Amino acid sequence: MKKYLALTMAACMALSLAACGSSASSTTSSSAAASTEATSDSAATAEATGSDNITGIAQCCDVGTLDDESFNQGCWEAVKGYGDESGIEYNYYLPSGEDASDEDRETLIRQAVADGANTIVCVGYLYGPALAWGATEYPDVHFIAVDVNGFDINRENGTIPENVFCVTFKEEEAGYLAGYAAVKDGFTKLGFLGGQAVPAVIRYGYGYVQGADAAAQELGINVQMNYYYGAQFYGDEKITAKMDGWYDGGTEVVFACGGGIWTSAAEAADKHDGKLIGVDVDQNYLGVEGVESGKYKANPFVTSAMKGLGAAVKNGLDTVNAGDWSTIAGTNGNFGLEEGDYVGLPTDEASWNFSTFTLDEYNTVLEKIRNGEIKVDNTSDDATKPTTSSNITVDYQV
């Protein structure tokens, strides 16, 4: 666990930003999509480096696409980067659609093992039941489970199998920082667009509400927020129409939290001169590229609420390959500001698109969260809404 506690935000950002570089292609079948990214050069490197503990890496996604420019891709770039650097063969496996079942996810694990993977990165909370099966079926395979906790795997007592390491994040802290910064920067009509109402998305959203409320109280103003889960991790005409309605009704900035669902918010924002907050990785480059290509009139991204996906995946792989699995076996690393700089907003000048909110103000509130002066509610139950003051009105829409 010490390896994780030693991470810095620089490492997190470097790996997260790697997601900007490319999107992998895939071949589809009726049940899954898989791609092998190994090359002859990688094989030669493997002989030189002697990768004895990991013989093959797989990333299995619970839902969505690989090139979502967010969660799935942030993890994949870490897997790909690790394989390229170490010379270890790596693959990815995708379910065939948004309605994939636990059995479909079990099939992906089975296929990954058949293809030679002995270390599998399972990405997404929905992988819990399939992991319970896979850990028993393949006791010699190491599973790194991102956004999965013990109760997702074992709903009776939360026990994590010895060949599984769970990685979760305190998304509520990143969401808080985004909401706080937005209101301090002058936005008073906010929106939260979630994908599916899964725990990580809920924590991001509820943190966003709490941060916006705190800033409104400090400023002595009233703010309004629209709040909605789109029940999917991709953008489409339905979600775009919903966002058109928000922006047309006065919403100034939307925190789009849910894989590729951001595309609908960005499309609507461009039509209405609105703004956007990205998620999981620094998504500012998407706005920059959109302007350069003529897709957007202006960069809609104000900031992004990030978590160290790439760093967590890389260090998990390092631990396996170093033969140190016993240090994390059967545990859940839950990472936030107390543990290190695992969550936050991008502070690089190119991505700092606030008008009045300063880096000093950001660092002040960040340290208050880190030292416990500010406590952010980490509720991940959609039925339990965060407690707020009269300074914020939240319209929870269905």
Across the structure, where does each feature detected by a protein language model lie?
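C-terminal motif of bacterial Sec signal peptides marking the signal peptidase cleavage site
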Residues: 16-19
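Bacterial signal peptide processing site
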Residues: 21-23
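A residue-level marker of the well-folded mature domains of exported/periplasmic proteins
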Residues: 26, 30-37, 41-398
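Positively charged n-region of N-terminal signal peptides that target proteins for export
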Residues: 1-11
